[in-house]
A protein has these predicted regions:
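Extreme N-terminal tail/first-helix region
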Residues: 1-14
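Left-handed beta-helix
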Residues: 12, 17-18, 23-24, 29-30, ...
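Phosphate/pyrophosphate-binding betaalpha-module
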Residues: 46
């Protein structure tokens, strides 16, 4: 869905489950998947999701107007009901279910964030 003349750029191989909302300045790489009721809202800044990344059910990805963009690397798994806000998750990382990552957080390559974490 476009917002303020910004339209998502979604590769043809991306899977978007029912109820998924991708809004504004969002780019999603090859073979990634966004599952049921995921919201990617890039209304005031951009969101970039790499290739082969899996965003599971009920996750919210959002940005802050004056804060950092959201950058999610390649081959990342984001568990159910995660909130990612203005953060960076590097390649081959796992974000556990119910975690909340706030503005400025950087998760390193091949890292695991335990379920229910607040960073």
């Amino acid at each position: 869905m476009s917002f303020n003349n910004k339209k998502p750029m979604i590769k043809p191989s991306v899977f978007l489950a029912d109820g998924c909302r991708v809004i504004g300045d969002v780019s999603i790489g090859d073979d990634s998947s966004l599952w049921f009721n995921v919201v990617c809202r890039a209304d005031v800044n951009s969101i970039k999701i790499g290739s082969r990344t899996n965003i599971q059910d009920n996750t919210i990805i959002h940005v802050n107007h004056k804060g950092p963009k959201v950058l999610i690397g390649n081959s990342v798994t984001v568990g159910h009901q995660v909130i990612l806000h203005g953060c960076k998750v590097k390649d081959q990382s796992l974000i556990g279910m119910g975690s909340c990552l706030l503005d400025g957080v950087v998760v390193g390559e091949k890292s695991i964030v335990a379920a229910g974490s607040l960073l």
